[in-house]
């Protein structure tokens, strides 16, 4: 299982802050594409990704037992 944590607007759009996916291995790009399709998360394309509390680059490999945090850009004034 890979644990996915969603923050801010992404969590609101998905209706949850945490999702577990039953996969042994995936890339961060595959996870983002799957969540975009399943939950309609259009803003996920601009989100930062952290795996096990460390920011990673696009298309990083993720394995079962990892935690992936998807953090959208923050705006305000």
Curated annotation (Swiss-Prot):
Modified residues (1-thioglycine): 77
GO cellular component entries: molybdopterin adenylyltransferase complex
UniProt superkingdom: Bacteria
Post-translational modification (record): C-terminal thiocarboxylation occurs in 2 steps, it is first acyl-adenylated (-COAMP) by MoeB, then thiocarboxylated (-COSH) by IscS.
Keywords, comma-separated and alphabetical: Molybdenum cofactor biosynthesis, Nucleotide-binding, Phosphoprotein
GO molecular function, one term: nucleotide binding
One Gene Ontology term from the biological process aspect of the record: Mo-molybdopterin cofactor biosynthetic process
Ranges annotated as spanning the membrane: none
Pathway the protein contributes to: Cofactor biosynthesis; molybdopterin biosynthesis
Residue numbers of Glycyl adenylate PTMs: 77
Family of this protein: Belongs to the MoaD family.
Function: Involved in sulfur transfer in the conversion of molybdopterin precursor Z to molybdopterin.
Subunit-level organization: Heterotetramer of 2 MoaD subunits and 2 MoaE subunits. Forms a stable heterotetrameric complex of 2 MoaD and 2 MoeB during adenylation of MoaD by MoeB. During catalysis MoaD shuttles between the two heterotetrameric complexes.
Protein name, as recorded: Molybdopterin synthase sulfur carrier subunit
Organism: Bacillus subtilis (strain 168)
Highest classification ranks of the organism: Bacteria, Bacillati, Bacillota, Bacilli, Bacillales
Gene: moaD
């Amino acid at each position: 299982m890979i644990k996915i944590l969603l923050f801010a607007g992404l969590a609101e759009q998905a209706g949850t802050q945490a999702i577990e996916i039953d996969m042994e291995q995936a890339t961060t790009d595959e996870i983002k594409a799957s969540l975009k399709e399943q939950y309609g998360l259009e803003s996920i394309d601009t989100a930062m990704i952290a795996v096990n509390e460390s920011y990673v680059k696009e298309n990083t490999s993720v394995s079962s037992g990892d935690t992936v945090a998807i953090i959208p850009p923050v705006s305000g004034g």
